[in-house]
């Protein structure tokens, strides 16, 4: 029971914080939405490539 109560309070605080942030930085998000999307896509692609390459090298070595 104690555990359940703790998790419930945590989720409540998180929801409140998220709501406030959205209302505050709504205009900013609209302005830099394209830039953020492009950055995230590039980072994901680069990370995936490096991981695959490193895994292949390690396998060959071992």
Curated annotation (Swiss-Prot):
Keywords: Chromosome, Developmental protein, Differentiation, DNA condensation, DNA-binding, Nucleosome core, Nucleus, Spermatogenesis. Protamines substitute for histones in the chromatin of sperm during the haploid phase of spermatogenesis. They compact sperm DNA into a highly condensed, stable and inactive complex. It is found in: Nucleus; Chromosome. Testis. One of its GO terms (cellular component) is nucleosome. GO terms for biological process: chromosome condensation; sperm DNA condensation. Its main location: nucleus. PROSITE patterns: PROTAMINE_P1 (PS00048). This is Sperm protamine P1. Belongs to the protamine P1 family. Residues 1-62 are annotated as: Disordered. One of its GO terms (molecular function) is DNA binding.
